Swiss-Prot record:
Keywords: ATP-binding, DNA damage, DNA repair, DNA-binding, Nucleotide-binding. GO terms for molecular function: ATP binding; ATP-dependent DNA damage sensor activity; damaged DNA binding; mismatched DNA binding. This is DNA mismatch repair protein MutS. The keyword Ion transport does not apply. Gene3D superfamilies: 1.10.1420.10, 6.10.140.430, DNA repair protein MutS, domain I, MutS, connector domain, P-loop containing nucleotide triphosphate hydrolases. InterPro entries: DNA_mismatch_repair_MutS (IPR005748), DNA_mismatch_repair_MutS-lik_N (IPR007695), DNA_mismatch_repair_MutS/MSH (IPR017261), DNA_mismatch_repair_MutS_C (IPR000432), DNA_mismatch_repair_MutS_clamp (IPR007861), DNA_mismatch_repair_MutS_core (IPR007696), DNA_mismatch_repair_MutS_N (IPR016151), DNA_mismatch_repair_MutS_sf (IPR036187). ATP binds at residues 607-614. The keyword ATP-binding applies.
Length: 864
């Protein structure tokens, strides 16, 4: 379109829009943000606001939509959640200062990953932006949180990119426009940047200038070895500068993260363990929602971070444990005080980018004074000593804010009443002129009534017409000659006098001057706070850590969590362990033991559907995870050896977007585990092979279990319905059979959820189907077919020889296939003997005795 054919204001808009073609432009016009042309159409649809027209361009009506300035946050929040970026264009010039339109410019760009406004953010979630820079060998990652000042980088590989993004939970991902990452093809929140912005040399130059250093070796970054990571960090920092229209001063020193710092968990594991999100995508009930007793939002965010980043450094874990133990008698008063603490972390971020509001500073002031009053007994905890020493360091900042900001300032700076009385003499004088106006008006009204003798005379004020003298219609004709008519009403006339006009000019001028001066003073306070940002961030981190540690103490005291022990030898010993989430959802939870060590590395877990196999496996993984966060664990006792990674293969789901079936997803996850698990890994495998035919599934399940035993040698919990797999312990001493018990009462079934030695006698699938409400006719038919299949299987035992067709790596036949056929009876006799030997009749309750009797009976049937 021709710019000469449009108004000067529209020319200005088109020039700004041309620089931000990929964003919606909020163009400030008075008390509204307006959008034009395609932006207006899109915004009207997304925000459900009115689409209208105004004027014409090239003969076509200009489409237009707008949102009120004071309500812009709620609309921005909706757009950001939809993955949109918005350029905020403000009026920066004085209205009427020149012949053309008022000067406007984009003051910031709101993108999903660069939010700082509390109204646009989830209180308990960390908002991160991640830069991804793929190279031939490695992928450079850099991520930051403008709210916390976090700034980190890492080298990773293509096969681990999904896992890293799942861990970081990025709100926005930056990617070079010349590079492709298959994992990001369907991802939302991806922003493409020019590839040159990811150049390592440009990145190093920008980073060294920002941190004021000669090179990046002090951050653990080598220019050659970490070039791709440095490029990602540089691109990220530059993007933040462009979107915020300034270089924020609160980003922590850049740090290089390595795999050895935390226990590794892939994307499937984080999903299956439901750490911060359920399998259905909800926020509750999850591990996070169940454990989150934090008093502050900062604490809740740090808790989520710790849960997703379990430590491997035993010294750091023990430091947290000692702090938790020291707080067990102090956590209640501490949490009461922490409830009065504002979100210092996010307030500091808003100070850094220059958009903090008056009440942010008031909340910061009150919080700093509150933190300084925290009095804790460290009880030998060096971590507590370090944390509590931080708070007095901010008292000088708190005192400066007390002097500068009113106890209860206005919400908006434009409304005035923000700067404290006595802070600036000129402001106090301007306020005196405004505030003593009532006395002048009362005196003027009394004097004018006496002078004119008009009883209906009143001196008043409104925002539209300013100050005026009002007379009734009957007395208006008697107004003195110096009364100048200002407004005519139905029953009254309004006048102005030279004396009243002079006072009005003085008051209005004082008001304008006071507002301008308050803005100037407030900006000065914000500028002075820039130097205090490192200490403010330090206080925020210390308060959040205290909040999480006191939450861990509350869990230990109120939910009977115990301090786990750590061993240098391979072991996972848990006495009466409980699932931390499930036990809060049910009236009675059955606790269970877990014993894995160098002799028994794989637990083959059998039992009925709904018997609790998946819950038990997740329980073990969550106890291990919690132990490495420094939290006490839901058990009577726990001893855990070295753990480097946790893997899970639980549940069934497809990936239609990538054209992968349920079985393909299952096999992909299984393959990843077999390629990456080590002797120090914990592996959870649930129903491997169920997505294909019986023989294929059984063969695959056997092969996977054997691979875990012989190659990976990981600690493994392997749940299966393939009863044939229960022969594995006879061939592999490191495998052990355990089962979840159930009790049959006629045609009904009672799940005892108790882990017992040996394999399960049956799966109770039809009984579970009955509980699910299958029609009686279908159940009878299923039972009939089951009886026929069992009879056929009994008459044709050789079908178990399926493994004999599978060549081993050495070319000979696998020993398990022949063993199943030849030693079946001996195996069952061994199981019966072992089960009887472990029974102590004198210690069993009637219910347990009956359960054991039924179990032994089922085993005897199998032998016969």
């Amino acid at each position: 379109m021709s710019k000469s054919a449009v108004s000067p204001m529209m020319q200005q808009y088109l020039g700004i829009k041309a620089q931000h073609t990929d964003k919606l432009v909020f163009y400030r016009m008075g008390d509204f943000y307006e959008m034009f042309f395609d932006d207006a159409v899109e915004a009207a649809k997304l925000l459900d606001i009115t689409l209208t027209t105004r004027g014409q361009v090239d003969g076509e009506p200009v489409k237009m939509a707008g949102v009120p300035f004071h309500a812009a946050e709620q609309y921005l929040a909706r757009l950001v959640k939809l993955g949109k970026s918005v350029a905020i264009c403000e009026q920066v010039g004085e209205v009427g200062a020149g012949k053309g339109p008022v000067e406007r410019k984009v003051v910031r760009i709101v993108t999903p990953g660069t939010l700082t406004d509390s109204a646009l953010l989830e209180d308990k979630e960390t908002n991160r932006i991640v830069a991804v820079s793929p190279d031939k060998k490695y992928i450079g990652l850099a991520w930051a949180s403008l709210q916390s000042g976090e700034f980190k980088t890492k080298l990773t590989t293509v096969d681990k990119l999904d896992d890293e993004l799942a861990r970081l939970q990025a709100a926005e991902i930056l990617l070079p426009d010349s590079k492709n990452a298959p994992q990001l093809q369907t991802a939302s929140g991806v922003t493409r940047l020019n590839a040159w912005q990811f150049a390592a040399d440009a990145g190093e130059k920008l980073l060294t200038e920002y941190f004021g250093c000669q090179d990046l070796r002090g951050f653990g970054l080598d220019g050659k070895e970490h070039a791709v990571a440095i490029g990602a960090a540089g691109a990220l920092l530059n993007y933040i500068r462009l979107t915020q229209n300034l270089m924020p001063q609160h980003l922590d020193g850049l740090s290089l993260e390595t795999d050895s710092q935390y226990i590794g968990m892939d994307a499937a594991t984080r999903r299956n363990l439901e750490i911060t999100q359920t399998l259905s995508g909800k926020k509750s009930p999850t591990l996070m929602s169940t454990l989150d007793l934090c008093a502050t939002h900062m604490g809740s965010r740090l808790l989520a971070l710790w849960l997703h980043h379990p430590l491997r450094n035993r010294a750091h874990i023990r430091a947290r444990q000692e702090a938790v133990a020291a707080l067990e008698s102090q956590y209640k008063p501490l949490q009461c005080r922490l409830k009065n603490i504002a979100d210092i972390e996010r307030i500091a971020a808003r100070i850094a980018v220059g958009n903090a509001r008056p009440r942010d500073l008031a909340s910061l002031r009150d919080s700093l004074f509150e933190l300084a009053q925290i009095d804790l007994s460290a009880n030998g905890s060096s971590l507590l000593e370090t944390l509590k020493a931080v708070f007095p360091e901010n008292l000088s900042t708190a005192e400066q804010l007390r002097q500068a900001i009113l106890p209860e300032p206005s919400v908006w700076l434009k409304d005035g009443n923000v700067i404290n009385h006595g802070f600036h003499p000129e402001l106090d004088e301007l306020r005196r002129i405004q505030n003593h106006g009532d006395e002048f008006l009362l005196d003027l009204e009394a004097k004018e009534r006496e002078r004119t003798g008009l009883s209906t005379l009143k001196v008043e004020f409104n925002r539209v017409h300013g100050f005026y003298i009002e007379l009734s219609k009957t007395q208006a004709e008697q107004a003195p000659a110096d009364y100048q008519r200002r407004q005519t009403l139905k029953n009254a006339e309004r006048f102005i006098t030279p004396e009243l006009k002079a006072f009005e000019d003085k008051v209005l001028t004082a008001q304008e001057q006071a507002l301008a001066l308050e803005k100037q003073l407030f900006d000065g306070v914000l500028k002075n706070l820039q130097t205090a940002l490192p200490q403010l961030q330090k206080a925020a981190k210390a308060a959040a850590a205290l909040d999480v540690l006191s939450t861990f103490s509350a869990l230990a005291k109120e939910r009977n969590f115990v301090r786990p022990e750590f061993a240098d030898y391979p072991a996972i010993h848990i006495e009466n362990g409980r699932h931390p989430v499930v036990e809060q959802q049910v009236r009675h939870f059955t606790a269970n033991h877990t014993n894995l060590d160098h002799k028994h590395r794989l637990m083959l877990l059998t039992g009925p559907n709904m018997g609790g196999k998946s819950t038990y496996m997740r329980q073990v993984a969550l106890i291990v995870l919690l132990a490495h966060t420094g939290c006490f664990v839901p058990a009577d006792a726990a001893t855990i050896g070295p753990i480097d990674q946790i893997f899970t293969r639980i549940g069934a789901s497809d990936d239609l977007a990538s054209n992968r079936s349920t079985f393909m997803v299952e096999m992909s996850e299984t393959a990843y585990i077999l390629h990456h698990a080590t002797e120090q890994s914990l592996v959870l495998m649930d129903e491997v092979g169920r997505g294909t035919s019986t023989f294929d599934g059984l063969a695959l399940a056997h092969a996977v279990a054997e691979h875990l035993l012989q190659k990976n040698k990981s600690f493994s919990l392997f749940a299966t319905h393939y009863f044939e797999l229960t022969y594995l312990p006879e061939a592999h001493a490191a495998a052990v059979n355990m089962h979840l018990s159930a009790l049959e009462q006629g045609q009904d079934i009672v799940f005892l959820h108790q882990i017992q030695p040996g394999p399960a006698g049956k799966s109770y699938g039809i009984a579970v189907a009955k509980l699910a409400g299958l029609p009686v006719r279908a159940l009878k038919s299923a039972q009939k077919h089951l009886n026929g299949l069992e009879n056929q299987a009994a008459a044709n035992r050789p079908q178990l020889d399926i493994f004999s067709t599978m060549p081993s790596e050495k070319g000979d036949e696998p020993n398990v296939g022949n063993f199943v056929d030849k030693a079946e009876e001996k195996h069952f006799e061994g199981i019966l003997a072992a089960a009887l030997e472990k029974l102590d009749p004198d210690s069993l309750t009637p219910r347990e005795a009956l359960s054991e009797l039924y179990r032994l009976k089922d085993l005897c049937k199998s032998v016969s």
